[in-house]
UniProtKB/Swiss-Prot annotation:
Residues 29-52 are annotated as: NMP. It is an enzyme of class 2 (transferase). GO terms for biological process: ribosomal small subunit biogenesis; rRNA processing. Residues 102-112 are annotated as: LID. This is Putative adenylate kinase. One of its GO terms (molecular function) is adenylate kinase activity. The keyword Transferase applies. The keyword Kinase applies. It comes from Methanopyrus kandleri (strain AV19 / DSM 6324 / JCM 9639 / NBRC 100938). ATP binds at G10, G12, K13, T14, T15. Broad-specificity nucleoside monophosphate (NMP) kinase that catalyzes the reversible transfer of the terminal phosphate group between nucleoside triphosphates and monophosphates. Also has ATPase activity. Involved in the late maturation steps of the 30S ribosomal particles, specifically 16S rRNA maturation. While NMP activity is not required for ribosome maturation, ATPase activity is. Associates transiently with small ribosomal subunit protein uS11. ATP hydrolysis breaks the interaction with uS11. Its EC number is 2.7.4.3. Transmembrane segments: none annotated. It comes from the Archaea.
């Protein structure tokens, strides 16, 4: 079984996947694969982002034959890949702000990522892709996992628990006042 690990930049996708690799699971980091395959189509300097060839990466994931079951495909666009399950990592915006500052992100990029996490862009995209336009209820193969306050090992364990039980967390930053205040501080950069 191939499982996508996705989420807003900074939520801990790579860190969680490295912990899963340490536990013996196969992991593909799509950003690394995109560089190795020369599948980066352009650099969006204004957004400080790379535009990748999704068709080439989908083909790569389809043809990938991992040894472990499950195996993980990691990227903020992994939910667009042909996988059996999507895990969307979620992180409280105040913690995301701290991490992005530590990584040296400029305020404009922090604002973009905080807003994306606050409204659940990756989760919404995954639901849209997996539900094929039918939004009566979220598809069962898209699961949110809140990693706020968890260690690397705890987050990996939480992901495996969500995979095994096909159940995750209900995440709603929109009704969280601290999350609202965190995002509001960055509105001037949007």
């Amino acid at each position: 079984m191939k499982i996508a690990i996705t989420g807003t930049p900074g939520v801990g996708k790579t860190t969680v996947c490295e912990a899963l690799r340490d536990l013996g699971f196969d992991v593909v980091h799509l950003n690394k694969v995109a560089r190795e395959m020369d599948a980066i189509l352009e650099e969006d300097e204004q957004r400080q982002a790379k535009v990748v060839d999704l068709h080439a990466l989908r083909r790569y994931v389809e043809e990938w034959e991992p040894e472990s079951d499950p195996a993980f495909v990691e990227s903020h666009y992994a939910h667009l890949m042909p996988t059996d399950l999507v895990i969307v990592l979620r992180l409280h915006p105040s913690e995301l702000e701290r991490r992005l500052k530590e990584k040296g992100y400029p305020p404009e990029k922090i604002a973009e990522n905080l807003e994306a996490e606050f409204v659940g862009v990756c989760y919404g995209e995954a639901v849209e892709v997996r539900s094929e336009g039918c939004f009566i209820r979220p598809p069962e193969d898209v699961i949110q996992v809140n990693v706020t306050g968890l260690s690397r090992a705890e987050a990996a364990d939480r992901v495996l628990e969500a995979v095994n039980h096909r159940r995750g967390d209900d995440v709603d930053w929109l009704s969280d006042e601290e999350a609202q205040r965190t995002v509001e501080r960055y509105l001037k950069y949007r």
